[in-house]
């Protein structure tokens, strides 16, 4: 995956609120439910609001996927904390086979997979399919299929822990971008 390829995929992606409109009424309800429950703490808002490097964030998702329902709205909330520096888009896994084949996790076409890029679409990191706290919650419950449907929203503690995991990853990428000698030279800082 090079910057040209990623730029094309990003351009074809949809902003969050347009992406969820691709789902059925029930799917849209599930995504809105988690989005409405998700809230950054004041410290998280301040942290994301302090990002100075532009980040491109592309999520490979499935509107039908329970893990996407329970994690993508959290990433959108982070992006909303600094819309001038965090540009987030989503693409459908099944409509982007060429992309997902390059992002296989444990030999599977897992989603969500988040691709973090610099302002010029240079890849900086790939994260998926679940955060550590999401895995802990699933292991504790030991219920349902390997890809839950997102019918029941996560409890508030799980939601907050998973949001914190995603915030850590956004911060890690921002620090990578901020400390990049290539970008520091470009921006003279």
Label for each model-derived stretch:
Residues 1-55, 77-84, 100-110, 124-189:
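Non-globular targeting/processing and membrane-anchoring segments
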Residues 58, 70-71, 153:
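Aromatic-enriched hydrophobic runs in primary sequence
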Residues 65, 96, 122, 132:
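Surface-exposed, flexible loop/turn segments at secondary-structure boundaries
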């Amino acid at each position: 995956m090079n910057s040209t390829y990623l730029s094309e995929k990003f351009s074809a992606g949809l902003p969050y609120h347009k992406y969820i409109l691709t789902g059925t009424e029930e799917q849209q309800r599930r995504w809105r439910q988690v989005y409405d429950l998700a809230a950054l703490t004041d410290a998280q808002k301040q942290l994301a609001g302090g990002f100075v490097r532009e980040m491109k964030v592309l999520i490979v998702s499935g509107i039908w996927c329970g893990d996407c329902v329970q994690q993508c709205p959290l990433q959108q909330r982070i992006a909303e904390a600094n819309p001038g520096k965090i540009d987030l888009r989503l693409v459908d896994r099944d409509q982007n086979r060429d992309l997902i084949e390059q992002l296989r996790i444990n030999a599977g076409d897992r989603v969500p997979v988040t691709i973090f890029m610099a302002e010029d679409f240079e890849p900086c990191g790939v994260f998926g399919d679940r955060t550590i706290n999401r895995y802990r919650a699933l292991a504790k419950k030991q219920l349902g299929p390997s890809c839950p449907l997102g019918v029941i929203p996560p409890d508030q503690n799980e939601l907050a822990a998973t949001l914190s995991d995603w915030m850590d990853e956004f911060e890690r990428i921002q620090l990578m971008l901020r400390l990049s000698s290539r970008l520091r030279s470009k921006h003279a800082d």
